[in-house]
């Protein structure tokens, strides 16, 4: 018989969201298991140069880059092309900056990925030339 184990939290996928969920669970004292089907970690985040899209964030503001909730939401709606669930998109744009702050507080060394504009900049409504993409340099270096 195969070994059986129990966990408080099981996370499927090791992209930015999965790793963030596993880190948060561990920080809360939960026994956590992160499962990835691929040979390497990173999921969809690895496909986007290891970046996470976090609009209207404090690191960009500290760097003097302008952004706001409504502009970011306009761009997110453009990218979704009418396929979004409006409440989910609104929640992402509203909560992503808070998630960034929580990850930074846990010691994740996310930095602005300067020089990487939104995918549809400058033509996309609400797009930003800089400041919305985060990267964890130590993970990329490995």
Regions inferred by a protein language model and the residue ranges of each:
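Glycine-rich active-site loop/strand segments that organize a redox cofactor
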Residues: 54-91
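Short, hinge-like loop/turn segments at secondary-structure boundaries
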Residues: 49-54, 129-130
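N-terminal Rossmann-like FAD-binding beta1-loop-alpha1 element of flavoenzymes
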Residues: 9-34
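Glycine-rich FAD pyrophosphate-binding loop
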Residues: 26-48
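Switch/coupling segment of Walker-type NTPase motor domains
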Residues: 50, 65, 103
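Active-site-proximal beta-strand/loop segments in catalytic clefts of secreted hydrolases
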Residues: 14, 37, 56-57
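Core beta-strand elements of the Rossmann-like FAD/NAD(P) dinucleotide-binding domain
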Residues: 3-7
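Conserved redox-cofactor binding core of oxidoreductases
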Residues: 93-142
């Amino acid at each position: 018989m195969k070994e059986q184990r129990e966990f408080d939290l099981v996370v499927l996928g090791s992209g930015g969201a999965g790793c963030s969920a596993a880190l948060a669970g561990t920080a809360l004292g939960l026994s956590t298991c992160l499962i990835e089907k691929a040979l390497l970690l990173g999921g969809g985040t690895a496909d986007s140069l290891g970046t996470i899209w976090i609009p209207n964030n404090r690191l960009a503001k500290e760097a003097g880059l302008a952004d706001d909730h409504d502009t970011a939401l306009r761009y997110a709606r453009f990218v979704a092309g009418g396929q979004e669930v409006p409440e989910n998109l609104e929640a992402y744009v509203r909560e992503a900056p808070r998630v960034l702050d929580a990850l930074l507080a846990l010691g994740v060394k996310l930095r602005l990925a300067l020089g990487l504009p939104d995918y549809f900049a400058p033509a996309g409504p609400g797009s930003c030339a800089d400041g919305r993409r985060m990267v964890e340099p130590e993970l990329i270096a490995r």
